[in-house]
A protein has these predicted regions:
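Soluble or luminal CAZymes and related metallo-dependent hydrolases
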Residues: 7-14, 121, 149-153
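Acidic, amphipathic alpha-helical patches
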Residues: 56-58
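Catalytic binding pocket for nucleotide-activated donors in carbohydrate/polymer assembly enzymes
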Residues: 40-50, 73-148
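C-terminal alpha-helical cap of glycosyltransferases
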Residues: 145-167
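Conserved catalytic-core segment of nucleotide-activated headgroup transferases in glycan assembly
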Residues: 1-42
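Acidic donor-binding loop of glycosyltransferase active sites
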Residues: 62-70
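Flexible glycine/serine/alanine-rich "lid" or loop that lines and gates the nucleotide-sugar donor pocket
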Residues: 61-62, 80
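Short beta-strand/turn micro-motifs composed of small residues
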Residues: 32-34, 69, 87-89
Length: 167
């Protein structure tokens, strides 16, 4: 499933090369969390025969060394489980301003560098991205994943219901 402005003929070979590079650097095997709207599962020949798993993104990220994020809400799991993130895009994806801004906004927020998978990146650059600021992850949780209210969830819901139906 590909909701990005890219062609499979360019995107998948570049992604396969990037995965191979990471596997070599970190001596591990990349496992792909398939998009929930797809039925792609099992061995994907167009991605180097890597395993794709469906509906197990949270579990995969929880047990991972890092997460490779392509404009995905899966970022939330990486934040919650404090996993390093690689924010990736391609030359084609750069042409979609909304998509590219999304990647850049995330890399700015987390004070990291996004990776263009169509360009070469040194091993030292890749390894430097493994280090992340846990405080920024906490800030993200507070800014985007929780309520600003100090009340407990049941109090927020009760207050809402009272305002809507009883007052």
């Amino acid at each position: 499933h590909l909701d990005m402005p890219v062609t499979p003929e360019k995107w998948y070979p570049a992604l396969d090369n990037f995965f191979s590079y990471l596997e070599k650097i970190f001596n591990l095997r990349i496992i792909i969390a398939s998009h929930p709207k797809t039925d792609e599962e099992g061995c994907l020949d167009y991605l180097g025969n890597r395993t794709a798993v469906l509906n197990k993104t949270e579990k995969l990220i929880r047990g991972s060394e890092f997460a490779i994020i392509v404009n995905s809400t899966a970022l939330i799991f990486a934040i919650v489980y404090k996993k390093p993130i690689f924010l990736i895009y391609s030359n084609e994806a750069k042409k979609d301003l909304a998509m590219f801004r999304g990647v850049n906004n995330m890399s700015d927020y987390f004070k990291t560098k996004s990776i263009n998978i169509d360009e070469s990146v040194s091993e030292s650059q890749i390894k430097s991205l493994i280090n992340f600021d846990e405080k920024l992850y906490e800030n993200y949780k507070n800014d985007f994943l929780t309520s600003n209210s100090k009340n407990k969830n049941y109090q927020i819901i009760l207050e809402y219901l009272n305002k809507q139906f009883f007052i």
